[in-house]
C-alpha cells in the first residue's frame, strides 16, 4: 500500500463548551498510511503537553488510518487572541494547522 499523507482538520470549541469550565480543541487527522505519526500542540508557538490526549490510530474502511487529538484547557487558560496549532509529523513530513479563535467570532 502506498504512503498517504495525513489530512489535518482543527476544530474550535463550540460556544456551549466555552460556557462550561473546560474548553476542548480537536485535531482530526485522517487518510494517512502507514499508521504511525506524532501529534504536537502549540499555543502561540510554545509547545503544550498538559491537557493533551491523542487516540490510538484506527483503521478506516479504505485501509488508511485516522487519529483524534484533544487539547483540553480550563476556561481561564482560553485566550481567544492566541494562536492554537496542531502539528502532525508523519514519515518525516510535517503538516501544521493553526487557528486564532478571534478570527472566527
Curated annotation (Swiss-Prot):
Keywords: Disulfide bond, Endoplasmic reticulum, Immunoglobulin domain, Secreted. The keyword Nucleotide-binding does not apply. It is found in: Endoplasmic reticulum; Secreted. Pfam families: C1-set. Coiled coil: none annotated. Residues 1-105 are annotated as: C region. InterPro entries: Ig-like_dom, Ig-like_dom_sf, Ig-like_fold, Ig/MHC_CS, Ig_C1-set, MHC/Immunoglobulin. It comes from the Eukaryota. Residues 6-100 form the Ig-like C1-type domain. GO terms for cellular component: endoplasmic reticulum; extracellular region. SMART domains: IGc1. Disulfide bonds join 27-86. Associates non-covalently with VPREB1A. Interacts with SYNV1/HRD1 (via N-terminus); this interaction leads to increased IGLL1 ubiquitination and degradation in pre-B cells, possibly through a lysosomal, not proteasomal, pathway. Critical for B-cell development. This is Immunoglobulin lambda-like polypeptide 1. The lineage of its organism: Eukaryota, Metazoa, Chordata, Craniata, Vertebrata.
